[in-house]
Amino acid sequence: MGGVRGRTGHLAWYRTDEAADDVAFLHGFSDSAQCWEPVIRAMPGIRALAIDARGHGESGLPDEPIRYTAHRDDAALVLSSRPRDGGVVVVGHSMGAMSAAYLAASRPELVRAVVLEDPPTGAPGNHQDEKWSEPDWLAGLRALDLPARIARGRADDSSWPDDELEPWAVSKAQVNPHLFDLTFQQPIALTELLASITCPVLLIHGDTERGGLISPEYADDCARAAAGEFRAVQIAGAGHSVRRDNRPRYLAELTTFLTTVEART
């Protein structure tokens, strides 16, 4: 990704330029900030920030439990280092989407609006720190060299645009293996977070039959729970990585949402 690269504490980030950010992008588990490059490149003129999550990309990994409150605080640390009046639009995928929801619920001064691409649903109640381990699929990918990882991605997801494959493949080798020596805490219910989010929310999801995490029924639950303006969009034929499975439709929904938010400021 071109533009400006830097660090805030243990976190690595990428900005399109030195100007104030319009949109901040938070990636999913085992991805990196660079995985947002195809989307950012397809939106000329956008002033974007993309952050490597702890233990991912070029970010460091503090020796402490992996919790969504930590991901929230990491994003807040970077955003508050160059605050923008009224906040920025935060776009997240999967783990990054849940992190964005945590951030919007507790730091509204930093978030103007939020886009959630197929976040986990979470679960109600208080969760304890638990041991976890590296998923077999990730270990298998990390054992391959880069060309083989790219080939595996192309074979498994033949509909993805070619420019998605290399950053996806590179990111897998960047996951810090010490991540799995730390404990992990499951997130609270997404509906609980939405009840505390007052800014506009766009939920983009695919089909559960293709691996999507959000069903139409759960999207309806989210709409009922949301404290602020809320819209859910299901992109038929897409799975968990909605933007990779159907980039044109994803970009159309994202661009319309950003234009609407900008028109209100």
What does each model-identified segment do?
Residues 101, 105, 112-143:
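Flexible "cap/lid" loop of the alpha/beta hydrolase fold
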Residues 6-16:
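A short loop-to-beta-strand scaffold at the N-terminal edge of the catalytic core in hydrolase folds
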Residues 92, 96, 100:
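Gly/Ala-rich beta-loop-alpha elbow adjacent to hydrolase catalytic centers
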Residues 205-238:
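Conserved loop-alpha-helix segment in the C-terminal half of the alpha/beta-hydrolase fold
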Residues 40-41, 49-91, 238, 252:
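Active-site loop/oxyanion-hole signature of alpha/beta-hydrolase fold enzymes
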Residues 15-61:
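Conserved HGGG/HGGXW glycine-rich cap/lid loop of the alpha/beta-hydrolase fold
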Residues 229-265:
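Catalytic active-site module of serine/aspartate enzymes centered on a nucleophile-bearing elbow/loop
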